[in-house]
Amino acid sequence: IVQEVSNDYAVGLAKFFKEAFIKLTGDENSIVEIANYQTGDKDFSAILTNIKAKNPDAIFAPGNFTESALLVKQARQLGIEAPFMGGDTWETQEFIDVGGKDVEGVALSTAFDREKATTPEAKKFLDEYVKEYKGEPSALTAMAYDAYLIAIDGIKRAGSTDTVKIRDAIAATKDLECVTGMTTLDKNGDPIKGAVIKTVKDGKFTFLDFVEAK
């Protein structure tokens, strides 16, 4: 794991990945290295030299797009061939522009891809968006629309303009058809749903797989 310690989102993803991976493998030592860097860093040679010596099967590095692209690029220059995995912050054109051919084949998790636009709500959203904006919606756009759907559904179920009732109704969201899939909110307000896995192929983000939530 290579984490951007000044980025709370990246640190959170690294924490959840570590916990899930150790649980999945049943091996407390399955994570061979946890390396840290700061936002804005550009030279990762020291980190990567240490990682190369550990010879990992894969590297999870959920940081910002620029730093992550440089990290992957420098890893390839050092001869590290292990696959890289990241989060949705990688899904920007800048990541591909900075990383170039070196980011081909990486894997990243995100929330939306047109190939998984399987619900009627998703198909409706995709058709209307493309018609209006002449382009593909990003995962952030899809999630923003989901937030709208969740809020509207909560208001309808609350049957009131009382803010507490609306809040409680939203918190109780269960099996709501959204753009990114059927959505249920847990006790923390986080959505329980699957994740889209993408890769970079021929300089473009490409659908790879879909992982159901368990």
Q: What are the roles of these predicted feature ranges?
A:
Residues 1-35, 58, 151:
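An alpha-beta-alpha
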Residues 1-4, 55-64, 71, 82-87, ...:
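Periplasmic-binding protein-like
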Residues 72-145, 199-200, 205-213:
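Extracellular/periplasmic periplasmic-binding protein-like sensory domains
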Residues 5-9, 37-42, 64-68, 89-94, ...:
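Solvent-exposed loop/turn segments at secondary-structure junctions
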Residues 33-50, 120-121:
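Structural motif
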Residues 42-49, 54-78:
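Hydrophobic alpha-helical
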Residues 131-141, 152-204:
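Segments of small-molecule ligand-sensing domains
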